[in-house]
Amino acid sequence: MKRFGLIGHPIAHSLSPALFKAGYDGKYPYELIETADFEEAYSRFLNGYEGINVTAPFKELAYSKADILSDECRIIRATNLLVRTPEGIKAYNSDYLGVRLWLQEVSEGFGKVPTTSSGTADINRASSDAVALASAKCSKNIEAAMTPFEHSEKACPSGLSQSDWGFRKVPTTLVVGTGGAGKAAAVAAASLGMDLILMNRSIGKAEAVAESIFHMHDALQAEVRPMKDFRECFRKADIIIYNIPTAVPDLSGLTSEDFGTGKPKFILEANYKDPSFDNELIMKMKQSNPQASYTGGKVWLLYQALTGYEIFTGETPDLTRMTAVI
């Protein structure tokens, strides 16, 4: 029987085993390979597992072991998913795949977190209603999310026209934090032809990501801005992907003008344990701009699991059961 697992340290808190079990109703074993020694973890993978997820601090080390690299891994230079194939070990990046899937969903008006009767979004858990709404639509986008990059021209994804996005121009995506997940998010947005603004506390890291994106296609734009310009860039962006674990100083001071009115604004935050966008801030955003929406990190987790698990097994997992886990 095929076995799958997760390597990284620490990983005892991970939701991955429960998500995988739910996705396939316990059909396949999925285990935590808990050790701080990467070589030990990798050896255990080779000697007993069909595929593994990889989390911090092993993503770059795992990338270096791969015999075959997916397009996104070649650019991101990190992997969170290794699979045994007849040709060797193949690396993927399901952070990229999950964000790309979410971007395709919001392009159709899905992935929004609904509010309660008081107008406050509950971000301490993923909204089952929001996930169910996205789930009903996302399966048809999985194949598109896994397609190779569009290098031929700068265009909206999957043949959509700009009007299909609800924008009168190519969307501008602000990526805050360009570490592992942030770089994957930036590459996902770039692969769909979006204009990018990148910011990171270490500006050199953001510049390196911008250089990688330019090499994808010289028509792609990735502007690097310092963190002090967060508020200005937030106001300008149509899509914000927030990847840092703490709130930037300007976050709590965002105003109605920053949230905009009369046009969609989509926010995705990676951190689901202690999010920086709290209920008060989201309520202010929704009151300022009813077309703005916030998606919490558990939806990102769900989407990267959905795309990654299908690579593992060749079978689409049950998204309804996975949703119940988070």
What are these regions (language model features)?
Residues L61, A247-L268:
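Rossmann-fold NAD(P) dinucleotide-binding segment
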Residues G8, A91-Y96, L103, V170-A190, ...:
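Glycine-rich adenosine-cofactor-binding loop
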Residues F230-G253:
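Rossmann-like NAD(P)-binding element
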Residues M194-M216:
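NAD(P)-binding Rossmann-fold cofactor-contacting core
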Residues I267-L319:
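Rossmann-fold NAD(P)-binding glycine/threonine-rich loop
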Residues K2-E108, K284:
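Phosphate/diphosphate ligand-binding glycine-rich loop within oxidoreductases
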Residues P57, N243-T246, N271-Y272:
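Short glycine-/small-residue-rich Rossmann-like dinucleotide-binding loops
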Residues E39-A41, H217-K236:
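Short acidic low-complexity segments
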